Amino acid sequence: MTILPISAFSDNYIWTFIDKIAGVLDCVDPGEAGPIIRFAQSNQLTLRTILLTHHHYDHIGGVDLLIKQWPSCKVYGPIDERINNVTHPIKQGQSVQVGSLHFHILFNPGHTSTHISYYEPQQGWLFCGDTLFSAGCGRVFDGTIEELHESLLLFKKLPRNTKVFCAHEYTLQNLKFAHTVEPCNSSVINYMQQILKQPSPCTLPSNIDLELSINPFLRTDKEQVKQYALSHGANSSDSLDVFKVLRNQKNSFK
């Protein structure tokens, strides 16, 4: 099985699992139908499964057309009335079988109130929607900042070699903010230089080990990150207080 990011909109990735022997593909968060339909048709593939992480249009906008094209396609997603056409509603603690892949469902509210992620422990793959980005994290919409903080603490506990398949290409801009927070962090500096030199604009997947070294939202226990937060209005150096300031500062960062 092959994993391929299919681009959508300006910076979305629709992660696809391709099994050419079986003649099928599966995808995560198809915000647009066109790219998936064109890819499937050009490779003589049938869409078997759609996995959804949350209700935002750039993640579910293609579902209607895709299930019209492939009526037998299974659609997994969180229990949320804002998402239509989910054939298999799922929640924390359940699992999803997609071909040979066995995904555990992680409840990760914060970005939205019902956000979930798909974790495949045998392969070490995490499809985290808009909860975690490389060197960053999602904004808070209808979830809470406390929930988002807890969701990222959960990700910190995953094995370090876990590959992180984020839904957006935000890495370079996130690294610029990370460098503002930790100007002496050599991991941030080196990784920024690396991706500026690489020929491909795609920086994903990332991995938990890398994120623990470059992502300020996973580094709220580090002294320089604490000092940055305290100098920008944090009430204390407690992890949640630091996280709140980081998220607020990132919201207005240019």
UniProtKB/Swiss-Prot annotation:
InterPro entries to which the protein is assigned, alphabetical: Clx_II_MBL, Glyoxalase_II_hydrolase, HAGH_C, Hydroxyacylglutathione_Hdrlase, Metallo-B-lactamas, RibonucZ/Hydroxyglut_hydro
rRNA processing keyword on record: no
Enzyme class: hydrolase
Catalytic reaction list: an S-(2-hydroxyacyl)glutathione + H2O = a 2-hydroxy carboxylate + glutathione + H(+)
Cofactor note text: Binds 2 Zn(2+) ions per subunit.
Keywords: Hydrolase, Metal-binding, Zinc
Biological or metabolic pathway of the protein: Secondary metabolite metabolism; methylglyoxal degradation; (R)-lactate from methylglyoxal: step 2/2
Enzyme Commission no: 3.1.2.6
Cofactor(s) essential for the protein: Zn(2+)
Family, similarity comment: Belongs to the metallo-beta-lactamase superfamily. Glyoxalase II family.
Quaternary context: Monomer.
Name recorded for this polypeptide: Hydroxyacylglutathione hydrolase
Organism: Legionella pneumophila (strain Paris)
